[in-house]
Amino acid sequence: IVSARVMKLDPRRGGITVEIDGSEAYLLKSEQVPGEIYTEGDIIKVYVVGVSETDRGPRIMISRTHPGLVKRLFENEVPEIYDGLIEVKSISREAGSRTKIAVWSKDENIDAVGACIGPKGIRVAKIVEELGGEKIDVVKYSEEPEQFIAAALSPADVLEVTILDEESHSCRV
């Protein structure tokens, strides 16, 4: 994650030119969160997807919708993730709407979900704020597909999960 300053809006294509430590990058419309409004001079956090070499020099590919942005925000906010005590197993994101993040710890004494949410929800609240109010569900990861599926579908009450076919990853809930 890097901080970028909005330099110029492109109303024709919907993209945004930003400055990152003296270098320019272009945030494509497809990499912006629906509903977010940017103005020149805004400082925004972006995820660096990659850097490629072009005829005109290096090109920085950035995103506000990539699940990696959420992962890095959690690493910044939750020391247990940064230190490796808690592992982010998977992230499913519908940018601007909802994110589900599955977390796990080898140490049974660590409440991975509770640590990510933080006292009185303060840790996850900071991430929600950075993502413009996007809802975030932190769920406990399990190696048992039935348990993990039930947790991932929260807040819905799941009565039963039946694995129909391991190969095609199909189940009945």
What does each model-identified segment do?
Residues 1-173:
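RNA-contacting regions in translation and RNA-metabolism proteins
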